[in-house]
């Protein structure tokens, strides 16, 4: 549901954006924590819906998990200031602060709440959860991180994100595991450079915005809906392009940020980490291709329940973004010359 005609939702959406600005522009850890709390309290009214039991359950689960993460974060920064009197690097404290922020963004191994909550949300709320809600924890993580701990987290993210999405029938759960997988890539991008993280994050947000807009228009929440709906060839082609781009298959736009990260990994001789990350991407591409293949192959069946007709303006809009996904990689080659 979009919030253009609901003043209450628009107000909380504004507070949500404003709270992120408070956190990322604060010059103290306590100010960052206040921003995180305002962010939590503004997102709950957006996702709670008295008419939808799953949404109400998701808002309660979100509140509990984020509260635990906030308490851990506050406890860690207070303990650091009391015991150490400064913010020099300390392994135990840095791991505690990193763990709290990773739990905030739904990273593995603190990801157990993430797919369950995404299952109860609308596509628009899922988009906010998987993009905007990750900005503050990521920027705070970039200020103070434990390198060895984050390498372990990256491996967990890419593996759990890939394997967890294999047996899913819900599109929302599948996209949440895909988000966990991409989180591993984003954490490494953040460790290399904040600019590279921002570039990866922008590309990822662009790709999933197309996918979520697509699912919102077609009112799709489960994989079997792709088979029972009578979609024309152009809609299926657009779906295929965007799925493959999200998976990071060349020559689509989604491959570009992964290519840059693989390049950095190979230069720094992280061969095992490169192998694990590339193999995990192959697994995610496998479950995307499985959906696309079924969607195309089941076309001969006449047992279609719903005929989908998108108006020309919406179709042109989707076609434009799919074209950007195809041409983005070709145009990006000019950036290096």
Stretch-by-stretch model annotation:
Residues 1-337:
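Core, highly hydrophobic multi-pass alpha-helical transmembrane subunits of bioenergetic inner membranes
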């Amino acid at each position: 549901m979009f919030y253009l005609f609901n003043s209450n939702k628009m107000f909380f959406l504004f507070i949500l954006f404003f709270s992120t600005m408070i956190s990322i522009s604060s010059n103290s850890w306590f100010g960052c924590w206040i921003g995180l709390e305002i962010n939590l309290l503004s997102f709950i009214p957006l996702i709670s819906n008295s008419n939808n039991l799953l949404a109400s359950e998701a808002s309660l689960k979100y509140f509990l998990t984020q509260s635990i993460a906030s308490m851990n974060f506050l406890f860690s920064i207070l303990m650091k200031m009391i015991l150490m009197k400064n913010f020099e690097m300390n392994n135990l404290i840095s791991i505690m602060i990193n763990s709290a922020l990773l739990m905030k963004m739904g990273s593995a191994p603190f990801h157990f709440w993430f797919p369950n909550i995404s299952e109860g949300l609308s596509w628009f709320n899922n988009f906010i959860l998987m993009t905007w809600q990750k900005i503050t924890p990521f920027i705070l993580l970039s200020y103070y991180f434990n390198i060895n701990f984050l390498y372990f987290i990256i491996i967990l993210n890419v593996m759990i994100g890939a394997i967890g999405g294999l047996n899913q029938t819900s599109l929302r759960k599948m996209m949440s595991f895909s988000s966990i997988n991409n989180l591993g890539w984003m954490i490494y991008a953040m460790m290399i450079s904040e600019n590279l993280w921002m570039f990866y994050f922008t590309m990822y947000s662009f790709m999933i915005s197309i996918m979520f807009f697509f699912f919102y228009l077609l009112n799709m929440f489960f994989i079997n809906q792709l088979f029972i709906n009578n979609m024309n060839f152009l809609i299926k082609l657009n779906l295929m392009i965007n799925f493959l781009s999200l998976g990071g298959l060349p020559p689509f736009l989604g491959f570009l940020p992964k290519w840059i990260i693989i390049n950095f990994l190979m230069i720094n001789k992280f061969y095992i980490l490169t192998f694990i990350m590339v193999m995990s991407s192959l697994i995610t591409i496998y479950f995307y291709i499985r959906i696309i293949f079924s969607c195309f192959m089941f076309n001969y069946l006449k047992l279609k329940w719903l005929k989908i007709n998108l108006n020309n303006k919406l179709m042109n809009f989707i076609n434009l973004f799919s074209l950007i996904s195809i041409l983005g990689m070709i145009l990006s080659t000019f950036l290096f010359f």
